[in-house]
């Protein structure tokens, strides 16, 4: 039993020694990566997400709140993502808002939990200036580089409309650099009006992929799905590139093992190169001794003591390696020594260099998660049966059935040979029962000499019992051997019994030589023949050695560079335990002086059996050089060791040969085995359509709906004339709308063609005519002829344009405003000396472009307007109006003061000036304010903006709202000029005709809503009119005399009606009958009587039409189809056809 315990401990000792020596891991194969599956670093994927919010002026209040709500919803969805493998997500979130500046709140370094993150995002305030996406991307990249975790997944989610400030740098290069650093971008558009090309440029998405929009109700789910795929792909890639962690702390030192099995005796070493020492100095001549009688020849004596080693000679050339000798027989076991004291544990050694990283096999698939809890039952729905649902989850596999009972059937016939099956999958290695000990195999070939370092001296084992004394040897004396190297002093042998031989001649005394260098330990010589037993000598005193001093603690070595993980090598075969070698006998503690070499004595009598010596542990000797590798010993007897750990599954073997043999008899039914693994996923068929569910309870009433005022309905049919009422008493009411156009009169019959007259004689050339009349002179002439009222009085005017140049306007719309201001100034201010104009350009700051005293000509005014710079920041309307109030302090006394505000957004909340206070100051200074608001009715901020427009304007009739900047038409200019110069402009409208505008929204009938027109086209002549054309707009054209003519709409009458007006200052006169043409007058072509109809298509071309009210031809834009016949290709054709002479 004791031998089994010793063998078991000896087998465990190499396993412990290969892993740790005094707390230090030895070199060897590194642990498999699969063994570290539960390691923290390998089980977590780090994810850093930065939300980038557009806080510019174009995002306004509602869009900025929508962005914060989106971040709140998506951040919660991100934490609901679960990895598909045995991993965990470690997620950190940060938020960044940008405009012309960037604010990071919160950063990644201050991440605590999701609740704190949501609170800080909700507290963000709108910056409200220009859009600079470049700085947002650069700051997000710097944030992820500095505070993002190494080897983590980095994602930036950018929300913007992609319409940057003109001074914003290009984002292409910085976006590409960020993606090279491993940052993934996801872009979201704020509205349907986005720059899709720029958003794709930032995210790197292909052109065929649609752009994500913030208004999409499924946006959160779409981005959650996209992030889930991104995280799974990135984290799986990171796991494959995992690195070895830091080495752990050294473990506690192991217990000392039992002494190993006695090893075999090694082969005899080659004799060393003995060199003869130098001859010593001649000593003094001794006294001649007494010459004795010659004795008998004695027996061969024992070999003499080993002589002193001579001085070390030079190293000779390295000789060839000798042939491996045959191992000698095992020696007798030595006496068992006493158990020594346990030594102190040595200091931990330095860490060894890390090995190359290994590549582990794929881990086992994780278990399926638990099923979620059942939600609360919802209300019973009402509706038709829906489409068949998707296939349900796969069911759990059923248990294996009980084995059937029955008698074994007869042996079946041998079936036909089937085809060779495919190579099977790699099987799982299952440790089987330990097999029986096999027969002892033949001795294997000699292994390659091992390379190892000298180990420390082991603890001396217990002294074994003395072996039996061998029989005396017999043999003839051999030749005298060469003088060998001096060996260690052996024990003093017993005194021999024999005839004293003759005394030898004394040798010359040599000079003492230099002490030689301690020689190498010689190999053990062959066991000599037993000498004659001598007399027992005196028993010496037992020596006791002192323990040597404790060695100095070595310095801790520096940590080696991390090496690459190597491929694990194949597991080698288990070695056989060696045979325990004999323990040497301790020598005497005091060596005696060497006596003279005596003659060989005769054979002595066998001595008595000696007592066992006391084992005394001597001091630790110096470490000797490495000896030659011994031959492998014979396989020793022993008990089979403990089964080793389960090895890795080997590669699948080659496909076996097709078996040939008869079918065996059917075996008896085996014992019922455990239930098998789950089978493959089944393929089900779609079930039948379910029955219609029961009618559910009625739902709660919905919230009240919101809607805008509908468009004005069509005019109803004319009612029957009522009886004439009594004359009422009251004040005169407002002027009514234009009535409907009457029915077109019956076309007269064409008269017969008269006889052609005789051609007259060509007359003489008349004198040169007078200079033609100007536009103003023609208007004055018409007024004098028609007698329709006084001409417009040019009233002195102080006009200040307050122009919004904020970020939401945009550079293109700002150019439209510039053109609009120049055109409006031409209509209003015929003389800059009478009507003076000032300009204020504002955004987050206010620029006084021109004062009221600056301009002397319209060319200077237009040049200043063209040189205005687009600011593109916030909307500080209150500060701009305050600057207008300061400018009006330079106004002339008693002159009308008008401010025209053109804006597209509500005032910035950070404006230091209060809008209500500034407007009150303007009203107190008798400043009349008009407002042109450009905003769509479906805009979320329309109600707020509309209230602000009414607050700014002097009264509700001074507010004009348009959907966009393209709808600033001349009709608006007329309404403004009616307020400024009422008589003159109203006269122009009544003389040339004006379409009736239907207000679609608002507080007053003065508000105008016009849709976007067709692109404008320019006319080539000395006077150009550039404008669009559609059903709701007018076309101003030039007559041959240069008069600006307005085409008569289809609703206008064909006759010149008397001009009636209820306005003050306008006198009513009767038209001059001499200038009126008779309605019964016939034209050469019936097309001349048709009203002008531009048509309904979009292919506009220039044509000429005849206006019978002024008996003149003019140009107009013809749409290309469905127009009236009153159109001609040239002015000449129109004149020849229609104009009456």
Swiss-Prot record:
Single GO MF descriptor: serine-type endopeptidase inhibitor activity
Collagen-like domain ranges (all copies): 243-300, 301-358, 501-544, 545-588, 733-769
Top-level taxon in the UniProt lineage: Eukaryota
GO cellular component labels: basement membrane; collagen trimer; collagen-containing extracellular matrix; extracellular region
CDD domains cross-referenced by the UniProt entry: vWFA_subfamily_ECM
InterPro entries in the record: Collagen_superfamily (IPR050149), Kunitz_BPTI (IPR002223), Kunitz_BPTI_sf (IPR036880), Prtase_inh_Kunz-CS (IPR020901), VWF_A (IPR002035), vWFA_dom_sf (IPR036465)
Domain BPTI/Kunitz inhibitor: 1088-1138
Biased composition (Low complexity): 335-344
Composition skew (Basic and acidic residues), residue ranges: 291-311, 735-753
Keyword match Disulfide bond: yes
Residue ranges, compositional bias (Pro residues): 345-356
Name the UniProt record assigns to this protein: Collagen alpha-1(XXVIII) chain
Organism (species): Mus musculus
Name of the gene this protein is made from: Col28a1
